A protein has these predicted regions:
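Juxtamembrane/interfacial segments at transmembrane-helix boundaries in multi-pass membrane proteins
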Residues: 14-18, 73-103
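Alpha-helical transmembrane segments
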Residues: 19-33, 95-117, 181-184
Length: 235
């Protein structure tokens, strides 16, 4: 239920959030954290050593990637003057030229974090088929397995839409109209399609990382987020 809740707050066809009460940036980040927590707990609950290892890796990825996403979005929030996702999206839509550098660096940091959050190569450590065979999902089957796989797929879509909706809001409606709604739906689908194609291109051009190297690579994403923060202070 967490991912559908997050999805209702994301700007998809409009610049404003459809559900403003859930549109606060901090709320959305911690809803993602709750989803990861229960996914890890689902793996630990079976008692299998393979699911336990997969769950611990999932938790470790959360520790590494969530600060990147939070800091990158926080920089965008500071540029917008609000932590509400509607204000952030509207600011990016009108693109303040004087704050271009912090926004571009924040975009790079959030793109890095989005790629990791989607569990694509080389960061699919929790479900590495050659090592753990589905990781936290090893002991699941039937309806339970289907629900968990559906949740993972939905999370990938929601994370990608959050990134695309906030940092590439062009084509989304600022004022409602029937023609604008139709155009916005088409543009939203095209943006998601382009995002999936770019991610697939990156995923198929890289090999899986060794587990111990993950933290070294994620420092690059945090570096982008930190540079965005520094450039915001200097700007």
């Amino acid at each position: 239920g967490v991912m559908p809740t997050v999805a209702t707050a994301l700007p998809v066809v409009t610049v404003a959030s459809p559900l403003p009460v859930l549109g606060d940036l901090i709320t959305l980040i911690y809803l993602f954290a709750i989803a990861r927590f229960f996914f890890a707990i689902a793996g630990l609950d079976t008692g299998s050593p393979f699911t336990g290892i997969g769950a611990s890796r999932e938790a470790m990825l959360g520790v590494l990637v969530e600060p990147i996403l939070l800091l990158g979005l926080w920089v965008a929030a500071q540029v917008a003057g609000s932590t509400h996702i509607s204000f952030i999206t509207d600011t990016v839509y009108h693109w303040p030229v004087a704050r271009s550098l912090p926004l571009v660096l924040a975009l790079c940091a959030c793109a890095f974090a989005t790629f990791i959050e989607m569990g694509k190569l080389p960061f699919d450590l929790a479900e590495a088929e050659q090592e753990l065979q589905e990781g936290p999902l090893t002991e699941y089957s039937g309806y339970g397995f289907a629900v968990l796989k559906w949740g993972i797929s939905l999370k990938q879509l929601v994370v990608l839409q959050m990134f695309v909706g906030v940092f590439f809001p062009w084509g989304q409606m600022t004022h409602f109209s029937a023609g604008g709604l139709l155009l916005a739906v088409v543009v939203a689908a095209l943006k998601l399609l382009v995002g999936v194609l770019v991610i697939a291109l990156f995923e198929n051009s890289m090999a899986r990382l060794r587990f111990v190297e993950t933290s070294r690579i994620t420092w690059a994403g945090f570096g982008f987020a930190f540079l965005a923060f520094v450039s915001l202070l200097v700007a």
